[in-house]
């Protein structure tokens, strides 16, 4: 998918990886970039607007833990204004295994609910035009950081959901792929809580190993958007972009 002249909604587009990705997207010249985030950041929005004045950048406050009906109402406002949306990026995430319910609500349920809400506008069975979803998951969805099992499980769930969305594309007209960053230098990983304090130094230990910058991750994210491969499981690690081949151990047969 060429980003130029497209309409894009980016949930959590002002976070660490999110904001650098928003910058890279704006440089690529979409028609509209709509950022949905929990906390407004006027300076960040102003920076994005200045980066490419030809791109219309707008912001709406959004908490992914709200009911689907509220999300649908917000999306209707956006669709009424833009008429069409080409790409939805689901990027909300927290890393704090003290907050079990919230971790699941933000990292998994929020992705499911936002996706469910946009189907009302995209699903070809309802006369919709289809669309593309990019879900930010994590390499911990492949193999857990076992000291943060709640976070890792929430990302594995989001990855599984995304893989299913891709297989449903012939029915819905909506394609999907996952973006799975490795350890990236963001505020998310500088300090966080392990489950039941099983490893108080988990963040410190992770950062002793090679990482990548948010800019490296963002640049590869844009490459994945441009590749636009339904069902792709993209690993963005150590500054590299790699498509992962998922090993099938069981098949429902339906």
Swiss-Prot record:
What does the entry list as the binding residues for substrate?
Answer: 138
Residues noted as binding NAD(+) in the record, renumbered to the chain: 10-33
Q: Which Cys-Cys disulphide bridges does the record give?
A: none
Domain of life, per lineage? Eukaryota
Q: Give this protein's Gene Ontology molecular function annotations.
A: alcohol dehydrogenase (NAD+) activity
Q: Which Gene3D superfamilies match?
A: NAD(P)-binding Rossmann-like Domain (3.40.50.720)
Please indicate if the UniProt record lists Oxidoreductase as a keyword.
yes
The alphabetized list of GO BP terms reads: alcohol metabolic process
Q: Which residues form the active site?
A: 151
A GO-annotated cellular component: cytoplasm
Entry keyword NAD: yes
What reaction does this catalyse?
a primary alcohol + NAD(+) = an aldehyde + NADH + H(+); a secondary alcohol + NAD(+) = a ketone + NADH + H(+)
Pfam families, alphabetized: adh_short
Q: What is its EC number?
A: 1.1.1.1
List UniProt keywords, sorted A-Z.
Answer: NAD, Oxidoreductase
The UniProt entry, under PANTHER family, shows:
15-HYDROXYPROSTAGLANDIN DEHYDROGENASE [NAD(+)] (PTHR44229), ALCOHOL DEHYDROGENASE-RELATED (PTHR44229:SF8)
The family annotation for this protein states: Belongs to the short-chain dehydrogenases/reductases (SDR) family.
How this chain assembles, per its entry, is: Homodimer.
Which named protein is this?
Answer: Alcohol dehydrogenase 2
């Amino acid at each position: 998918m060429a980003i130029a002249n497209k309409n894009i909604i980016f949930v959590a587009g002002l976070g660490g990886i999110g904001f650098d990705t928003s910058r890279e997207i704006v440089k690529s010249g979409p028609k509209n970039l709509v950022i949905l985030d929990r906390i407004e950041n006027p300076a960040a929005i102003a920076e994005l607007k200045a980066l490419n004045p030809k791109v219309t950048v707008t912001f709406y406050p959004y908490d992914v833990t709200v009911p689907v009906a509220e999300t649908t109402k917000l999306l209707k406002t956006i669709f009424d204004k833009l008429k069409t949306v080409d790409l939805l990026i689901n990027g909300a995430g927290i890393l704090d295994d003290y907050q079990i319910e919230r971790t699941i609500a933000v990292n998994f349920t929020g992705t499911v609910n936002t996706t469910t809400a946009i189907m009302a506008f995209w699903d070809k069975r309802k006369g919709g035009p289809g669309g593309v979803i990019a879900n930010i998951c994590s390499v911990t969805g492949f193999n857990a950081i076992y000291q943060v099992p709640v976070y890792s499980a929430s990302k594995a769930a989001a990855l599984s959901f995304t893989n299913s969305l891709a297989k449903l594309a012939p029915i819905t007209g909506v394609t999907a792929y996952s973006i799975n960053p490795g350890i990236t230098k963001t505020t998310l990983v500088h300090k966080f809580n392990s489950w039941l304090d099983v490893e108080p130094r988990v963040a410190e230990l992770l950062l002793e190993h090679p990482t990548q910058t948010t800019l490296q991750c963002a640049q590869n994210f844009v490459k994945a958007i441009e590749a636009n491969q339904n069902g792709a499981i993209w690993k963005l690690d150590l500054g590299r972009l790699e498509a992962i081949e998922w090993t099938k151990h069981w098949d429902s047969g339906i």
